[in-house]
A protein has these predicted regions:
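Extracellular beta-strand elements of beta-rich domains used
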Residues: 49, 210, 232, 252-254
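Extracellular/lumenal carbohydrate-interaction signature centered on repeated Trp-anchored short motifs
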Residues: 100-111, 202-205
């Protein structure tokens, strides 16, 4: 299996548990929507790493892994000099860090975050599956209408469930660091169109701030209206290039369009 796809599937695995045969029950997002209330307020703090303490764990967050055979990236709260942030380190590894959360993208369409890339694996390229690593990614998982899934996507859900006993979300957007691809480049995963990568910029050594309209990006990437967001995560990986990567992540929040 493509290691990049395996990583994203593992994100879905972390979001959900076992379920029955109906296709909608094979979506991790179905259970999350049933379990969680939509976040309210003027601003949704999806990740408040700055409120933590260096060396402690981030409440409500957990790791998702590529496979039992893949080495795992490390995530820890650290002091950055300007506050506490989450640091991800990969050494030929590929795993991420996530939390389950329910957000209405129509009410809070704008995502804001910052990251600082400190080390990049050589030879990465998000447009080439065999080199699709990134020192920094922000991952957004969505619920959706299972009836819209085509035969291939349904087969992928059932196969994944049969092999692992776990589930995937309906769709995923990955906001990715890249130095060689133009900002705004959208790349579909080579195995499923329900995973789309959007390049947001490059740069090494300095903090970069980002703002994206998730509602507009979803429409552009998938050609349909998004349902609720059901998960937010980050990922620092070097599993394809077998190199080293290191990045720091600041807080992640959602707000209405100004």
């Amino acid at each position: 299996m493509n290691p990049f796809l395996a990583a994203v599937l593992a994100f879905g695995m972390a979001l959900g548990g076992c379920a029955g045969a109906p296709i909608e029950e094979l979506l991790a997002s179905t259970a999350i929507v049933a379990d969680l209330q939509v976040e309210g307020g003027a601003r949704v703090e999806a990740a408040r790493f700055s409120a933590g303490r260096a060396g402690e764990s981030q409440p409500g967050w957990g790791r998702f892994v590529v496979s039992p055979f893949a080495s795992k990236s490390e995530y820890a709260l650290v002091e950055s000099g300007s506050g506490v942030v989450l640091e991800g380190r990969a050494d030929g590894s590929a795993s991420g860090f996530y939390q389950r959360i329910r957000i209405d993208p129509a009410r809070h369409p704008v995502i804001e975050w910052r990251w600082r890339v400190l080390q990049t694996p050589a030879g990465l390229d998000p447009r080439v599956p065999a080199r699709d690593d990134s020192p920094a990614r922000v991952i957004i998982a969505f619920h959706g209408d299972a009836a819209r899934l085509d035969i291939g996507e349904r087969f992928a859900l059932r196969l994944y469930h049969a092999l692992t006993g776990d589930k995937m979300p309906y769709a995923i957007i990955m906001y990715s660091w890249a130095s060689d691809a133009p900002v705004g480049t959208i790349t579909a995963n080579d195995q499923t169109g329900k995973i789309q990568t959007i390049v947001v910029g490059g740069g090494v050594g300095e903090w970069r701030e980002f703002r994206r309209n998730v509602l507009e990006d979803y429409r552009l990437a998938f050609g349909e209206e998004p349902w609720d967001i059901v998960g937010v995560g980050v990922m620092t990986d070097a599993g394809n290039t077998r190199g080293k990567a290191r990045a720091q992540y600041g807080d992640i929040s959602f707000r209405p369009e100004p």
